[in-house]
């Protein structure tokens, strides 16, 4: 069986503390203040996370509705890698364990009251097989209504070694989820800056693909290097603009697999959940939106636009504009 999915090369622990992006700064960059003043926090919105799993971190406040393990078939929630937990924390960690002396939760996620359904399809090394991902997609479609899933975050990308049939199967699966009312948010991958470097399933015409706004730095971590302008770029082979939206993704501090800890990671894997959290806020305001309507709202709300910042995309996520 071909190893078709992998954590991306630059999803590394970045150790230079002076450049850490705390979640409160992320939320300032994407302009969340008006949304929070409106009382939006993601409550009663369910986000599915397809990744390495999720640890029972205290920041998740018993909001993990269901955990399904397609790798080892374990029943209790766990994350033997940490990537999925980090992603979930960006989307909706409460920040409980990050209070400063003033009581401010520095590391709360974008939508800190969302509920989670977590599908473990990647192993402890961040690798997976296409069959597990497809099983996860089938499970999600069968249980979408039971858990009222509105959003699916996929912060992984298919490797080039995957066969054409596997690629088509995955693209069909995410398109079907979209057709059934799930807003699919994917990472653009970290193979930029060359054109046509967006990973699958991010090349799908339907799904929303997210790149890193702050990828124009070069940092050295403990196990590798982030290349400058690492975010995957389009257009795709079918001349589709990808990624559509940019969000912060470099040196983001979020939940670790330790129940009380936090860790720093970088990559489009971190940018995608920023957008998933923002979409959760928007669904709280507009619960009847279809994925297509939400995607149009994102197109209309981004600022600055791509042409204003020299990027081939729609533009930068702007939450206040999104939730009006």
Identify the meaning behind each predicted range.
Residues 2-48, 71-82, 226-234, 317-320:
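N-terminal domain-start motif of subtilase-like serine proteases
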Residues 53-55, 70, 97, 122-126, ...:
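Solvent-exposed loop/turn segments at secondary-structure junctions
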């Amino acid at each position: 069986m071909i190893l078709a999915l992998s954590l991306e090369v630059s999803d590394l622990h970045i150790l230079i503390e002076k450049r850490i992006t705390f979640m409160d700064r992320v939320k300032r960059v994407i302009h969340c203040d008006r949304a929070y003043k409106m009382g939006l926090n993601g409550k009663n919105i369910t986000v599915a996370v397809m990744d390495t799993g999720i640890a029972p971190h205290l920041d998740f406040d018993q909001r993990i509705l269901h955990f399904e393990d397609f790798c080892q078939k374990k029943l209790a929630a766990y994350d033997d890698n940490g990537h999925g937990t980090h992603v979930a924390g960006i989307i909706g960690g409460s920040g409980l364990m990050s209070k400063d002396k003033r009581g401010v939760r520095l590391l709360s996620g974008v939508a800190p009251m969302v509920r989670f359904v977590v599908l473990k399809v990647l192993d402890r090394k961040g690798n997976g097989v296409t069959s597990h991902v497809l099983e996860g997609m089938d499970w999600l479609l069968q249980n979408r209504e039971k858990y009222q899933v509105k959003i699916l975050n996929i912060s992984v990308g298919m490797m080039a070694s995957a066969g054409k049939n596997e690629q088509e199967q995955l693209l069909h699966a995410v398109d079907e989820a979209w057709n059934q009312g799930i807003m699919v948010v994917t990472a653009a991958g970290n193979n930029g800056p060359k054109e046509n470097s967006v990973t699958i399933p991010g090349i799908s015409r339907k799904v929303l693909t997210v790149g890193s706004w702050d990828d124009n730095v070069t940092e050295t971590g403990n196990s590798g290097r982030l290349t400058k302008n690492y975010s995957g770029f389009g257009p795709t082979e079918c001349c589709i603009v990808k990624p559509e939206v940019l969000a912060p993704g470099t040196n983001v501090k979020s939940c670790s697999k330790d129940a009380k800890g936090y860790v720093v990671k970088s990559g489009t894997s971190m940018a995608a959940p920023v957008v998933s959290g923002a979409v959760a806020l928007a669904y709280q305001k507009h619960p009847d939106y279809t994925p297509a309507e939400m995607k149009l709202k994102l197109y209309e709300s981004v600022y600055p636009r791509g042409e204003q910042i020299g990027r081939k995309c729609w533009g930068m996520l702007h939450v206040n504009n999104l939730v009006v």
